[in-house]
Regions:
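Mature extracellular/secreted ectodomains of secretory-pathway proteins
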Residues: 1-118
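Short, low-complexity, Pro/Ser/Thr/Gly-rich segments in the mature regions of secreted, periplasmic
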Residues: 112-132
Length: 132
């Protein structure tokens, strides 16, 4: 992801948000409106939720060579923690997982769950899964 590249000199927050927006848009088949008979791909929704988990973890832990956070996402004061950032992303992840489950149940399919170690996390494909 561009925002976590140490050589990137641009706006890291913009890069993260643009990446997340593009991924979520792809998970929803680039549609703004949905109708009762519209279909979504449960695997794209599931992968999108996992990618957001990975991005949140990277935002909370990636540091520069000098030891400073590349992106400050949480309150740094240990006496006054503010974890609203993680709560908001947790809510989005939960909604995506719930939608993936609903779509999978509707289609009578199961979601392919990949076992991953968070330390070696790679982003999962969302846009490249193709259209139905």
């Amino acid at each position: 992801m561009l925002a976590f590249n140490p050589r990137y000199q641009g706006d890291r927050v913009l890069a993260v948000m643009a990446g997340l927006l593009g991924m979520v848009d792809a998970a929803f088949e680039h549609k703004a409106d949905f109708y009762v008979l519209d279909d979504l791909d449960e695997q794209k929704l599931y992968n999108c939720a996992r990618n957001i988990e990975i991005a949140v973890w990277k935002m909370s832990s990636t540091r520069t060579v000098s030891g400073q956070f590349q992106l400050v996402s949480n309150e740094l004061d240990p006496n006054n923690p503010n974890l609203s950032f993680e709560r908001e992303f947790g809510r989005v992840i939960g909604l995506l997982d719930f939608m993936a489950k609903i779509v999978a149940d509707k289609h009578g399919r199961s979601i392919t769950r990949l076992t991953q170690s968070i330390a070696t996390s790679v982003f999962l494909p969302v846009g490249a899964l193709g259209f139905k």
